[in-house]
């Protein structure tokens, strides 16, 4: 029954009082945690002297600084600048001035830093490829000297001799096996080791660079050494790292009176403490969904036990938001940061948060009511915009559809700000309809010296229907297929670090679809165009740990796992290819990059226990033998491309023992390529050409589907697959729109959008209205035709958007009528 606004106000007051008062029940950590004593502080201090050589084209008369960075609060929001002095006698001035400074830090400190120049603004150092240096790293185990070279500044050109590079393999000292997912840093360039333990740091100016290998989760001891790089040369640095043991660390914290209940989290510098090692919007680097949440322990205390690696430096703080919003502060208003070295025995840390506030401004309480059709089990987040939209923060549900968030800080460095609400942290996609989109104005608020209470209501959510769907689509006639018949869903690729957490959390929903298979779609990014570079970018691609967590979770819940790697292009894939040089040198680089990409995911699938690896895809069509660009012109792929693909697939087979599948669309009548000898299955993007309007009948679609199957699809199977005994799995997809016409062959066909236009969440396609019945009808036709063909070996629904239910125009079936139809059909096959 709807609740009146007056009744909501009274209910809100009652709940808010109980929300901020300490509870008298709950368990005490004293009942389960022995008094182990606090960890003694590491009082030994060491001096670290930094020498940096700057390029000759550095503007004169400007101060040079070493900026130490705080990845817990945010690299972009809490740096400390240390002035440097010229060290004229240390190097040949004709090669660039050398500056120096000395820091005194606790022993075993990991220093994250970069160099800046100060004029009217702070000018940050950049790499040779003109990317901002994220940070360099140094470990202060003993007094030492660090020597660095600045490649260039953001406002200058590269002025050194031709750069060189550092490359190598990182292995485990105890097993000799390669170690994937390690962060390797040198010369301001960062890379993560591949599944084979390999890494490469390109674009380094000649000179000595500090090289550090660091485990994002602290699972291995760090290694640090100098590496000399010569112009146009490779410095090989193969290093062995030692794994760490783990001990239990108990965090027990006393919080201020008035702390909202069950909102205290632990945020720190390791992966398992919320660090993404990527650059999030607003200069942040941590996500609440990965931060450990503390348990109420009576009084004003909260606690948690976390297994941490011995010898690791832990930087941490307590927070009611993330490392920036609502984090703990000292009494003078500064961000508080705690530090300790994990000992070789279990310990208990007894901490006290002095204040959640900073400055003289008081808290703001956001009291939100959401509509009754908000999906059960989904969380509501609030997102703030002080100078740009920052990481969304989870609100606390105090009653059904009633959410609260109290903002305490950091008001000392903020004035006006705007905010908005969204579901499941998917701001920009699953928004409050009043503030929807990537760049909305938002709702406004100005912090003040007095506490503020803001009562908000989300009247409607973007891309979420208020009325329940009518599920009246009849189930197709079931034809029993054997256990080898492949059924499942392929996930839509993520585009931000939090997506990996949400995908992992959504795996039980995939299990409930009864399909049996989940196709994970990890990504690498095309970060450079000439020469082409494809590599993991933690800003948008999952780390090794992320993919391993997703795979292990799916396997543990009884799913078969396939890994289907995908690219992240900086622009439309067609334009990327059209704008590429496509000369012989460029093609050599492209094949080298794709080879490394394919090998990495083959080894990843083998190590992580996936049963299938899917390669190919329409995005590589210009690189296949006889490849063409989107405008129909030849791509200029080398004449020996067939041999290059054979080599790639040979190497993939040598590294992965499971099923190897190839994704593709129907070819243009060409014979099967020779590299198909190394493929076990083909996953065909089946498009029978359905055009579905409100008056379209199932019988019409079944006729069209059967014509496609009996004609072009059967011809493809009989000529490409049957001779080699290879299986054909059909990938099915249809957008949730009415009247979509996939045929763009004539100008009279009206608006034309390829299926790729609907392959991302919440696509903006104004020419079509949503059509959920149409999507379900397409699925009914798919399932009424394809499984009846003996030579079809499986059905995969592609584009399942896991993070949240969206009633959008995309191909995702999550939360739409087609999902129920597919779930029931999968179940009936069992």
Which residues does each predicted region cover?
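Structural motif
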Residues: 51-60, 159-180, 251-261, 365-376
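Aromatic-rich carbohydrate-binding modules that target alpha-glucans
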Residues: 56-108, 118-138, 189, 257-311, ...
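Structured interaction patches on ligand/partner-binding surfaces of diverse proteins
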Residues: 118-160, 216-238, 244, 320-360, ...
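Substrate-binding cleft and catalytic face of glycoside hydrolase catalytic domains
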Residues: 473-481, 513-532, 545-629, 802
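Aromatic-rich peripheral "rim/lid" segments of glycoside hydrolase catalytic domains that contact
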Residues: 475-479, 747-757, 767, 773-779, ...
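Aromatic-lined substrate-binding rim segments of carbohydrate-active enzymes
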Residues: 506-508, 512, 520-572, 601, ...
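Aromatic-lined carbohydrate-recognition surfaces of secreted/lumenal glycan-active proteins
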Residues: 564-567, 612-618, 637, 642-670, ...
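Aromatic- and acid-rich polysaccharide-binding/catalytic face
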Residues: 601-602, 608-617, 664-707, 726-727, ...
């Amino acid at each position: 029954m709807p609740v009146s606004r007056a009744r909501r106000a009274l209910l809100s007051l009652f709940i808010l009082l109980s929300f901020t008062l300490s509870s008298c029940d709950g368990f005490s950590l004293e009942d389960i945690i022995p008094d182990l004593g606090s960890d003694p502080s590491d009082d030994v201090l060491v001096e670290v002297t930094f020498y940096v050589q700057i390029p000759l084209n550095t503007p004169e008369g400007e101060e040079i600084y070493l900026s130490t960075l705080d990845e817990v609060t945010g690299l972009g929001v809490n740096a400390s600048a240390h002035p440097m002095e010229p060290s004229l006698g240390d190097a040949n001035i004709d090669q660039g001035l050398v500056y120096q400074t000395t820091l005194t830090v606790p022993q075993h400190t990991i220093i994250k830093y970069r160099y800046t120049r100060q004029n009217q603004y702070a000018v940050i150092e950049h790499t040779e490829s003109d990317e901002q240096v994220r940070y360099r790293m140094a470990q202060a185990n003993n007094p030492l000297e660090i020597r660095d070279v600045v490649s260039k500044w953001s406002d200058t050109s590269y002025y050194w001799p031709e750069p060189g590079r550092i490359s190598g393999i990182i292995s485990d000292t105890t097993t000799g096996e390669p170690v994937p997912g390690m962060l390797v840093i040198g010369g301001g360039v960062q890379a993560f080791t591949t599944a084979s333990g390999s890494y490469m740091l390109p674009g380094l100016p000649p000179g000595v660079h500090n090289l550090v290998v660091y485990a994002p989760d602290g699972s291995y001891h760090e290694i640090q050494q100098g590496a000399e790089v010569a112009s146009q040369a490779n410095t090989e640095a193969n290093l062995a790292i030692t794994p760490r043991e783990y001990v239990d660390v108990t965090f027990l914290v006393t919080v201020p009176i008035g702390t909202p209940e069950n909102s205290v989290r632990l945020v720190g510098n390791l992966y398992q403490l919320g660090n993404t090692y990527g650059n999030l919007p607003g200069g942040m680097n941590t996500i609440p969904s990965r931060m450990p949440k503390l348990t109420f322990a009576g009084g004003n205390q909260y606690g948690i036990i976390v297994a941490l690696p011995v010898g690791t430096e832990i930087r941490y703080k307590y927070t009611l938001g993330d490392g920036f919003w609502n984090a703990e502060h000292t009494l003078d208003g500064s961000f508080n940061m705690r530090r300790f070295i994990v000992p070789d025995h279990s310990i208990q840390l007894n901490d006290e948060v002095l204040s959640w506030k900073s400055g003289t401004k008081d808290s703001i309480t956001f009291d939100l009511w959401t509509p009754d059709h908000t999906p059960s089990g989904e969380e509501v987040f609030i997102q703030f915009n002080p100078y740009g939209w920052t990481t969304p923060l989870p609100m606390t549900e105090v009653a059904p559809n009633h959410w609260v968030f109290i903002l305490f800080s950091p008001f000392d460095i903020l004035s006006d700000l705007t905010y908005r609400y969204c579901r499941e942290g998917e701001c920009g996609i699953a928004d409050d309809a009043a503030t929807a989109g990537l760049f909305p104005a938002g709702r406004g608020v100005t912090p003040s010296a007095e506490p503020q209470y803001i009562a908000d209501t989300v009247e409607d959510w973007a891309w979420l229907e208020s009325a329940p769907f009518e599920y009246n689509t009849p189930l197709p006639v079931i034809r029993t297929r054997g256990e080898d018949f492949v059924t499942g869903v392929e996930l839509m690729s993520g585009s931000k670090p939090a997506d990996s957490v949400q995908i992992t959390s959504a795996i039980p929903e995939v299990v409930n679809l009864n399909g049996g298979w989940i196709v994970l779609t990890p990504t690498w990014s095309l970060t450079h165009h000439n020469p082409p570079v494809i590599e993991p970018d933690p800003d948008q691609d999952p780390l090794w740990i992320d993919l391993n967590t997703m795979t292990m979770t799916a396997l543990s819940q009884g799913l078969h796992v396939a890994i289907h790697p995908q690219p992240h292009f900086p622009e439309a894939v067609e334009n990327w290819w059209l704008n590429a040089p496509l000369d012989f040198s460029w093609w050599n680089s492209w094949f080298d990059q794709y080879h490394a990409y394919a090998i990495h995911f083959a080894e990843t699938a083998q190590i992580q226990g996936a049963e299938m690896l899917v390669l190919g895809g329409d995005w590589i069509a210009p690189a296949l033998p006889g490849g063409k660009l989107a405008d129909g012109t030849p791509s200029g792929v080398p004449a020996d491309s067939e041999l290059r693909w054979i080599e790639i697939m040979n190497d993939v087979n040598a590294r992965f023992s499971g099923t190897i599948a190839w994704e593709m669309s129907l070819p243009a009548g060409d014979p099967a390529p020779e590299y198909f000898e190394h493929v076990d299955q083909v996953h065909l993007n089946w498009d029978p050409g359905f055009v579905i309007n409100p008056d379209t009948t199932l019988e019409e679609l079944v006729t069209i589907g059967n014509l496609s199957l009996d004609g072009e699809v059967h011809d493809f199977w009989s000529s490409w697959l049957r001779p080699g005994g290879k299986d054909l799995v059909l990938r099915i997809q249809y957008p949730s729109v009415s009247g979509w016409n996939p045929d763009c062959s004539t100008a009279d066909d009206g608006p034309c959008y390829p299926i790729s236009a609907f392959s991302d969440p919440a696509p903006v396609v104004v020419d079509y209205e949503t059509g959920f019945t149409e999507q379900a009808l397409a699925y009914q036709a798919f399932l009424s035709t394809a499984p009846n063909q003996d030579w079809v070996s499986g059905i995969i629904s592609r584009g399942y958007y896991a993070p949240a239910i969206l009633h959008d125009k995309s191909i995702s079936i999550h939360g739409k009528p087609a999902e129920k139809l597919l779930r029931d059909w999968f179940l009936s096959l069992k």
